[in-house]
């Protein structure tokens, strides 16, 4: 399984839950126009977490709640409840982003997808990775 555009920085809004819905597609570029069909996510699972740095032993700031929403259509989700967003905001850098002063670096994340194959070893792939920013809110 290969992925494109897997480095995606996430911006998590303060004071509200975070969620991301993803659809996995198998794209055939060998024909014109290209065709695509959903990847069947039956027997797949996701896991992901946010750490304060990329160093070994870095603190895990939060773990994503993950779900396969519609296996046949290749739809999955990652989310964070408000309590996790609050923790992320409290541990984010106090230094504001140079280009968007509302944002502060909160850490680094990745999401792993695992296929549990019957009778053989499970295979796992990192499907997403990047930085996590907290976007400071003003409304409580």
UniProtKB/Swiss-Prot annotation:
It is found in: Virion. InterPro entries: LtfC/p132/Gp6_b-sand. Pfam families: LtfC. Keywords: Late protein, Viral tail fiber protein, Viral tail protein, Virion. The keyword Transcription regulation does not apply. One of its GO terms (cellular component) is virus tail, fiber. Forms the collar, into which the side tail fiber protein pb1 is anchored. Homododecamer. Interacts with baseplate tube protein p140. This is Collar protein p132. It comes from Escherichia phage T5 (Enterobacteria phage T5). The lineage of its organism: Viruses, Duplodnaviria, Heunggongvirae, Uroviricota, Caudoviricetes.
């Amino acid at each position: 399984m290969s992925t494109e555009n897997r480095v995606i920085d996430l911006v998590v809004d303060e004071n509200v839950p975070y969620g991301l819905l993803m659809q996995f597609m198998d794209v055939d570029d060998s024909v014109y126009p290209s065709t695509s069909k959903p990847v069947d996510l039956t027997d797949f699972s996701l896991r992901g977490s946010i750490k304060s740095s990329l160093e070994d032993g870095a603190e895990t700031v939060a773990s994503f709640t993950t779900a396969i929403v519609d296996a046949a259509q290749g739809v999955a989700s990652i989310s964070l409840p408000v309590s996790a967003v609050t923790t992320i905001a409290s541990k984010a850098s106090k230094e504001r982003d140079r280009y968007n002063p509302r944002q502060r670096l909160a850490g680094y994340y990745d999401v792993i997808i695992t296929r549990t194959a019957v009778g053989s070893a499970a295979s796992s792939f990192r499907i997403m990775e990047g930085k996590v920013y907290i976007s400071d809110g003003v409304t409580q």
